[in-house]
């Protein structure tokens, strides 16, 4: 998750990381990256780290990073499994496009 955090924060200087939605089942909360609205949400799952893009269906994904939540009308997500290579340039482009979408 730390590598993803650094990449997301580095994609746009205005992106802010916050921890939200603390509850008894998840006392550590959930990392959320915002810039004029939520860009993406991080989640540590049992076998993966998931980045969820609440407006993902509106984002262009020419490199095919989205691999889950593909049937949703709004949301798209990327599950990263241990050993997966992070396509940094493509992920950075999704973050930048997410910021642009929020600002439009």
Question: Where are the model-predicted features located?
Answer:
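Charge-dense, helix-prone N-terminal extensions
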Residues: 1-104
């Amino acid at each position: 998750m730390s590598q993803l955090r650094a990449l997301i924060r580095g994609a746009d200087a205005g992106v802010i990381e916050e921890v939200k939605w603390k509850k008894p089942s998840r006392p550590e909360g959930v990392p959320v990256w915002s810039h004029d609205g939520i860009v993406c949400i991080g989640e540590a799952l049992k076998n993966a780290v998931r980045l969820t893009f609440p407006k993902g269906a509106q984002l262009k994904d020419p490199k095919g990073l989205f691999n889950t939540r593909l049937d949703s009308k709004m949301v798209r997500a990327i599950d990263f499994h241990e050993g997966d290579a992070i396509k940094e340039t493509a992920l950075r482009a999704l973050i930048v496009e997410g910021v642009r979408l929020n600002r439009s």
